[in-house]
Amino acid sequence: MGLRHILRIDNPDEKKILTTRCHPVRMPNPSLKQLVADMFETMHAANGVGLAAPQIGVTQRLAVIAIPPMMEERPDGTKVEVAPEQTFVLINPEIVKASDQEDVGLEGCLSLPGWYGEVPRAAWVTVEYTDLNGRRQRIRRATGLLARALQHEIDHLDGVLFTERIRDLSTLKSYSEEEAPATTG
C-alpha cells in the first residue's frame, strides 16, 4: 500500500480515533509486515521519529520508532556516524519500569504538524514488547530521545495525546519546517 494518511488532532472525526485506547495485536498476523513497512515509509516521508498505528487509522497496539544515527563533527568539518540508526517495531508494548525523575523536553507530533511543546516524561523507561517475529523483547532503561519516543508512542496506543501532557500550554508553539526539532509520532 505504501504511504498512509496521518490522522490529525484538528479534525474532529480523526481526533476521535486518535483518542481511542487501542486493542492488542493478535499474533501471528500475516498482514502485519506490510502494515509495518507502510508505517515506516509514512513516518520517514513526514520526517518523524515514531508513528503509532492509530495515527494511520488502525486501532491496534503497534508502533514504529527510528532514532536517527548519531553524528559527530570532525575538526575538518566533516561529519562521521558514531552510532547507527536504531529502529524498533513495537507490538503490544508496555512500560514496565519508569524513572521517578522527570525530563522536560520539546516534543512534537505528526498528528499536529508544526506544533511543539515542553512535555515532562520519565527520564528513563524499560519497555517490554513483541517483535515482528513474535518474540518478547525488552528495552532496558532507555534514555534521551528513545525514552521520549517510547513514551509518546505508547501514549498514542492508550489514546493520550502529547498536548494532554503539557503542563504549561504557553509552551505550545508553532515552528516553521526549517527550525523544527525531531518529531515523535
Curated annotation (Swiss-Prot):
InterPro entries (alphabetical): Peptide_deformylase (IPR023635), Peptide_deformylase_sf (IPR036821)
Active-site residues, as the UniProt record annotates them: 153
GO molecular function: metal ion binding; peptide deformylase activity
Note on cofactor: Binds 1 Fe(2+) ion.
Keyword Protein biosynthesis: yes
Homology family: Belongs to the polypeptide deformylase family.
Enzyme Commission identifier(s): 3.5.1.88
SUPFAM superfamilies in the record: Peptide deformylase (SSF56420)
UniProt keyword terms in alphabetical order: Hydrolase, Iron, Metal-binding, Protein biosynthesis
Protein's name in the database: Peptide deformylase
Cofactor (UniProt): Fe(2+)
Binding locations of Fe cation: 109, 152, 156
Swiss-Prot/TrEMBL catalytic activity: N-terminal N-formyl-L-methionyl-[peptide] + H2O = N-terminal L-methionyl-[peptide] + formate
Function: Removes the formyl group from the N-terminal Met of newly synthesized proteins. Requires at least a dipeptide for an efficient rate of reaction. N-terminal L-methionine is a prerequisite for activity but the enzyme has broad specificity at other positions.
Natural source organism: Roseiflexus castenholzii (strain DSM 13941 / HLO8)
NCBIfam families found in the cross-reference section: pept_deformyl, PRK00150.1-3
Pfam families: Pep_deformylase
HAMAP family: Pep_deformylase
Gene Ontology biological process terms in this record: co-translational protein modification; translation
